[in-house]
């Protein structure tokens, strides 16, 4: 869906009214950016681009702006953020909005204006008259958070928009390296396309050569190596992080966050929750939940709780300066490796 919108915009095709909604911030922001590039010239954007936040600005003002002729250009772009009245959420309004005026506008929009409602909400209230009117008269685009497979598919399709191809294995590895962040995937695909030049395919080797692991992904890999009893590789990742001037206290905090996520994921999975439900409950990216689910199978609940307790003690000791931070973290990692070696049936 989103690629169809981007393809149309690249051809210069626009709709008079858009309603962009969903929780995937990158898809919302990137789509708005592409609409802006298509509709408004750089030279006239100061005159013909208006942005309103309905938590602060009256809706009437946005509609009045939409009905104003563009100045020194063919079209005007009006972006309206946070139209919370499209949801079922009850909140105390700072400003009273004239919603009926918006209903009238979208049924007969100004031919020289592109009007964008930017609604960063998971769902719109389908019962509302305005939502029904939007579904009938506006172009609707949902920017939902993607699971692991959808993120891989997104990566493959993103390469296609650049007239390049990337295989599933290479795409999965790229997604893994950037922790599933769509904005990072976009940047890395741009970089990879530039690197391969006239060559059509982005290979796994290209990805391994050019894409650096995020700090979060390094922490995931560190824990992964530990649970798979790879002592040398575990310590190599840790020492590499120190060489990159990452603070031990920051590394420890990320390790702690990951183990808490593993424990929470394990609990919800045992209650029968799926990946998407767990991500929604924990308010984390579905891709992070997938990685945590894989690691959760390698620990008992008791082990996870003990590790989290040890990390809490270490956090206190680091912050009070009682012991050397690097030494504390090294000892913790070695103890964790020793525990997993003892749990190895071949040990």
From Swiss-Prot:
Protein name per Swiss-Prot or TrEMBL: DNA polymerase III subunit delta
Which keywords does the record carry? Cytoplasm, DNA replication, DNA-directed DNA polymerase, Nucleotidyltransferase, Transferase
Tell me the function of this protein. Answer: Part of the beta sliding clamp loading complex, which hydrolyzes ATP to load the beta clamp onto primed DNA to form the DNA replication pre-initiation complex. DNA polymerase III is a complex, multichain enzyme responsible for most of the replicative synthesis in bacteria. This DNA polymerase also exhibits 3'-5' exonuclease activity. The delta subunit is the wrench that will open the beta subunit dimer.
> What's the subunit arrangement here?
Component of the DNA clamp loading complex consisting of tau(3):delta(1):delta'(1). The DNA polymerase III holoenzyme complex contains at least 10 different subunits organized into 3 functionally essential subassemblies: the Pol III core, the beta sliding clamp processivity factor and the clamp-loading complex. The Pol III core (subunits alpha, epsilon and theta) contains the polymerase and the 3'-5' exonuclease proofreading activities. The polymerase is tethered to the template via the dimeric beta sliding clamp processivity factor.
> In the Enzyme Commission scheme, what number(s) does this protein have?
2.7.7.7
Catalytic activity, per the record?
Answer: DNA(n) + a 2'-deoxyribonucleoside 5'-triphosphate = DNA(n+1) + diphosphate
Matching NCBIfam families: holA
Question: What is the consequence of disrupting this locus?
Answer: Essential, it cannot be disrupted.
């Amino acid at each position: 869906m989103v690629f169809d919108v981007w393809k149309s915009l690249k051809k210069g095709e626009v709709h008079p009214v858009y309603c962009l909604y969903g929780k995937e911030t990158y898809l919302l922001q990137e789509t708005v950016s592409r609409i802006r590039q298509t509709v408004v010239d750089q030279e006239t954007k100061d005159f013909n681009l208006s942005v309103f936040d309905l938590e602060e600005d009256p809706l009437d003002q946005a509609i009045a702006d939409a009905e104003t002729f563009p100045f020194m250009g063919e079209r005007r772009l009006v972006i309206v953020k946070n139209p919370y009245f499209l949801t079922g959420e009850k909140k105390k309004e700072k400003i009273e909005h004239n919603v009926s005026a918006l209903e009238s506008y979208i049924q007969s929009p100004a031919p020289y204006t592109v009007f964008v409602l930017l609604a960063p909400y998971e769902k719109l209230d389908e019962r509302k008259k305005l939502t029904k009117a939007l579904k009938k008269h506006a172009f609707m685009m949902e920017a939902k958070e993607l699971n692991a497979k959808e993120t891989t598919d997104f990566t493959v399709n993103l390469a296609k928009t650049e007239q390049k191809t990337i295989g599933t294995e290479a795409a999965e590895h790229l997604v893994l390296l950037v922790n599933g962040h769509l904005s990072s995937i976009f940047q890395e695909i741009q970089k990879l396309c530039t690197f391969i030049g006239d060559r059509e395919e982005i290979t796994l080797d290209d990805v391994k050569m050019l894409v650096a692991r995020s700090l979060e992904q390094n922490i995931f890999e560190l824990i992964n190596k530990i649970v798979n009893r790879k002592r040398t590789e575990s310590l190599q990742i840790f020492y590499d992080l120190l060489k990159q001037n990452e603070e031990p206290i920051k590394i420890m905090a990320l390790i702690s966050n990951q183990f808490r996520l593993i424990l929470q994921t394990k609990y919800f999975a045992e209650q029968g929750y799926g990946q998407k439900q767990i991500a929604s409950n924990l308010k984390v990216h579905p891709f992070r939940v997938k990685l945590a689910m894989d690691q959760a199978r390698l620990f008992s609940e008791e082990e996870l709780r003990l590790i989290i307790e040890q990390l809490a003690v270490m956090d206190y000791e680091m912050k009070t300066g009682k012991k050397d931070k690097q030494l504390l973290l090294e000892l913790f990692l070695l103890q964790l490796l020793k525990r997993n070696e003892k749990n190895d049936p071949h040990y």
